[in-house]
UniProtKB/Swiss-Prot annotation:
GO terms for cellular component: plasma membrane. The lineage of its organism: Eukaryota, Metazoa, Chordata, Craniata, Vertebrata. Glycans are attached at N5, N195. One of its GO terms (molecular function) is G protein-coupled receptor activity. This is Olfactory receptor 1D2. Belongs to the G-protein coupled receptor 1 family. Residues 1-25, 80-100, 159-196, 260-271 are extracellular. Residues 50-57, 121-139, 220-236, 292-312 are cytoplasmic. It is found in: Cell membrane. It is a multi-pass membrane protein. The keyword Transmembrane helix applies. It comes from Pan troglodytes (Chimpanzee). SUPFAM superfamilies: Family A G protein-coupled receptor-like. CDD domains: 7tmA_OR1_7-like.
Length: 312
């Protein structure tokens, strides 16, 4: 695969975080455990919300969709990663790499947009509680979610189509855990100025605007909470936002660790930061949203109790 221009029929080699057999075995069991925890946690969240009428509210509607997105996200990357860790053949086809890239980019954008919509939901619940039912009607919730899907699908499509115009020369060894946009652009031997410009422009629209919206929402929420005279009511109001605030902090924090740096400085060390947003964040979200949530505790308890009774 060395030398010369590479055609679309060529393959990439996903070498991962380490080429040491001993370390690869450790990484295999670590990622397998994390994947299983992520799948079980997010499936339980989805089942609990769908089966319990008490959780048929806008907040839990978006949470179920966030769990679905996280489930889809890890399934797009981790199984292939596990196969590579156990196999001598670490190749991924050109088409397979672009497919993985498309879903990766789309689902990260979708996660981001859903978190922004959830921030709006929390803003309405805290700042306009009397109008919550009408402001967050089922029709509006479906419309907002549909908009999130359309924007994220278009975002992924734009960058994947632009990537098909990129030419790769020389070695196609990727010292990374999956086909990631920044890594692929660094391997390019053609002009990637268009890709870079579109990446910045669309990134500002898809990520910075929703992030700014989240910040503004929480500034208004905090102002509203501080005006509440009762300390117990302040705590109750803040506790309704704490889980979402934790998820937002984890998502944007890990994303900034990877992407807030110039393209030419991207290195193998960024694999560790990538694991944080690609594996750890989807795994932690079910715990964040259910840890101190009495409604979720009750729904999960009823769900598990019902299934255990069927088995006995």
């Amino acid at each position: 695969m060395d030398g010369g221009n590479q055609s679309e029929g060529s393959e990439f080699l996903l070498l991962g975080m380490s080429e040491s057999p001993e370390q690869q075995r450790i990484l295999f069991w670590m990622f397998l455990s994390m994947y299983l925890v992520t799948v079980v946690g997010n499936v339980l969240i989805i089942l609990a919300i769908s089966s319990d009428s008490c959780l048929h509210t806008p907040m839990y509607f978006f949470l179920a969709n966030l769990s679905f997105t996280d489930l889809f996200f890890v399934t797009n990357t981790i199984p292939k990663m596990l196969v590579n860790l156990q196999s001598q053949n670490k190749a991924i086809s050109y088409a397979g790499c672009l497919t993985q890239l498309y879903f990766l980019v789309s689902l990260v954008a979708l996660d981001n947009l859903i978190l922004a919509v959830m921030a709006y939901d929390r803003y309405v619940a805290i700042c306009c509680p009397l109008h919550y039912t009408t402001a967050m009607s089922p029709k509006l919730c479906i419309l907002l979610l549909s908009l999130c899907w359309v924007l994220s699908v278009l975002y992924g499509l734009i960058h994947t189509l632009l990537m098909t115009r990129v030419t790769f020369c020389g070695s196609r060894k990727i010292h990374y855990i999956f086909c990631e946009m920044y890594v692929l652009l660094r391997m390019a031997c053609s002009n990637i100025q268009t890709n870079h410009t579109v990446l910045i422009a669309t990134g500002c629209f898809i990520f910075l605007i929703p992030f700014g919206f989240v910040i503004i929402s929480y500034v208004l929420i905090i102002r509203a909470i501080l005006r509440i005279p009762s300390l117990s009511k302040k705590y109750k109001a803040f506790s309704t936002c704490a889980s979402h605030l934790g998820a937002v902090s984890l998502f944007y924090g890990t994303l900034c660790m990877v992407y807030l740096k110039p393209l030419h400085t991207y290195s193998v060390k960024d694999s560790v930061a990538t694991v944080m947003y690609a594996v750890v964040t989807p795994m932690m979200n079910p715990f964040i949203y259910s840890l101190r949530n009495k409604d979720m505790h009750g729904a999960l308890g009823r769900l598990l109790d019902k299934h255990f009774k069927r088995l006995t």
